[in-house]
Amino acid sequence: MLWFASCWDEESVDFIESFAPPCYKVASASLTDIPLLKKMRATGRPLMLSTGMSTMEEIAAAVDAIGRENLLIAHATSSYPCPPEHLNLNMIRTLKAQYPECVIGYSGHEVGLAPTWAAVTLGAAFVERHITLDRAMWGSDQAASVEIGGLLRLVASIRDIERSMGDGVKRIYEGELAARKKLRRVVSAPALPTN
């Protein structure tokens, strides 16, 4: 299993770098800490930038500071748990349009799984959810976390969504042929007189 970390200061980057992580996560709270972002970028590893509690201008400043190469951007709203009306999932489309060369994903802090599934349908290439053994445990983000059973359902349904999206080309599938033969109706009209 691969793992990576969010570093909250430059010294932590030095420490985590000794473990050769596959990438670094920039926590939403650190998006405006440009020296920290540059320190992570200097490792040469991919960066995942979370965008909670940020303006488009702050996101642009962070991206300008670290460049778009090997950059993943996660739409996020930093409320724990986040009410549905604050999720603003259409930001995924906005980020995809603004940063077409970056991989755009979703970092969810909501209760339930449906918004994360919707994010995938809207084009999120990756998702992040907090995981817990028990949502009733003490802690600021436990209620917005997913228990193990929920994680299994989340992943299985995402795989179903990926298979369901198709390529956008209309076709008749083999499974439709019998129904087509049995149910298809042909409408005809009598020949109209010609003048």
PLM regions and their residue ranges:
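Catalytic cores and adjacent flexible loops of soluble metabolic enzymes
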Residues: 1-194
